[in-house]
Regions:
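Short gly/ser/thr-rich secondary-structure transition/capping motifs
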Residues: 18-25, 98-100, 156-158
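Catalytic core of membrane glycerolipid acyltransferases/transacylases, capturing the structured
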Residues: 18, 31-96
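Alpha-helical membrane-targeting segments
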Residues: 1-20, 72-87, 165-171
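Non-catalytic C-terminal accessory region of glycerolipid acyltransferases
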Residues: 4, 100-308
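Generic structural signal for secondary-structure transition and capping sites
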Residues: 21, 36, 88, 115, ...
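Secondary-structure boundary/capping positions in well-ordered alpha/beta enzyme cores
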Residues: 23, 58-59, 89, 113, ...
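A generic local structural motif
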Residues: 11, 23-28, 47-49, 76, ...
Length: 308
């Protein structure tokens, strides 16, 4: 596995990607020459997990969702072989015991003195903004006794938006901030308020590095809202297409057109999504402590906003 990783990075895939995308790095001097560390990055695109390890001289391991390792057919087997070959670890995101297993997998990487990549948001941003971090990254940093390197991926969402299989040829950037030391909280990894405070500090640094707008709600909650809006719109369109259902509405609109001002057009799915900007952290509610231990940080507790 280790040999395959270095062959891909330095001989096969790495040189081709560097030639095509001409990636740039800012803050390379902050990368530790030795010892374990967590690289906590924003998450804009699938290609983040390719370009970040490519631009870091040392080997980096990411905790990848288990779906990548269980696909069927030629494509599924090829995907699983690739992720195993580059040293990625499968993670079950269902929470509970699965979250605990993910935490232990990450800690094993750190205790070997290696670099571990984590996306505190837990999923890709649905709209390019930075979302509230999950506290698993904080717990892993405290239990592993390691520093956290804030990382901002630049332009990967434009090169490979969600749903696009082949990335657009354009320059990709990686910004690596100064290491964050949380040793002052040693022994407090079970304090949910400490975990929230650490996570918010990490997200604040990511906001400064990336220049992204910060939204104090979970990215998964935003995705749920966008999906719900899309389903509602689809139902409305389906109902409007039924025979006879639109006729009476049209007659009413024509009758009222002389007396009433023009009606506002229906809200599109994109409009509905754009309207969801308010602070909704309270709606997420405190998560249970078991879920807080997942590799993507599948837990949280109510706490300070990252920008506070």
């Amino acid at each position: 596995v280790l040999v395959f990783y270095w062959v891909l990075k330095t001989v096969v895939l790495g040189p081709i990607l560097k030639l095509l995308f001409r990636p740039w790095v800012e803050g390379e001097e902050n990368i530790p020459d030795e010892g374990a560390a967590i690289f906590a990055s924003n998450h804009l695109s699938f290609s983040d997990s390719i370009f970040l390890p490519l631009m870091v001289p040392r080997r980096m391991t990411f905790l990848a969702k288990s779906d990548y390792f269980t696909g069927r057919g030629p494509k599924g087997r090829l995907t699983a072989a690739f992720f195993k070959g580059v040293g990625q670890l499968p993670v079950d995101r269902s929470g509970g015991r699965a979250g605990e297993a993910a935490l232990r997998s990450g800690l094993r990487v750190l205790r070997r003195g290696e670099l571990l990549g984590i996306y505190p948001e837990g999923t890709r941003s649905p709209d390019g903004r930075l979302y509230r971090g999950r506290t698993g990254v904080a717990r892993m940093a405290l239990e592993g006794g390691v520093k956290v390197m804030p990382v901002a991926m630049i332009g990967t969402d434009k090169a490979q938006p969600t749903g696009k299989k082949i990335p657009k040829l354009m320059r990709i950037g990686v910004k690596i901030g100064k290491p964050l030391d949380f040793s002052r909280y040693e022994g407090m990894e079970d304090d949910r308020f400490v975990l929230r405070s650490i996570t918010d500090e990490i997200m604040y640094e990511l906001m400064l590095l990336s220049g992204q707008e910060y939204v104090d709600m979970y990215a998964t909650s935003m995705k749920d809202r966008i999906l719900a809006a899309a389903k509602t719109k689809a139902r409305e369109l389906q109902e409007a297409a039924l025979p006879g259902t639109a006729a009476k509405e049209l007659e009413d609109a024509l009758d009222a057109s002389d007396d009433a001002p023009p009606r506002r057009r229906g809200t599109s799915v994109d409009d509905a999504a754009a309207d969801i900007d308010e602070d909704t952290a309270a709606e997420d509610g405190p998560a249970d402590s078991a879920a807080s231990e997942s590799a993507d940080g599948d837990a949280s507790a109510s706490g300070r906003r990252a920008a506070s």
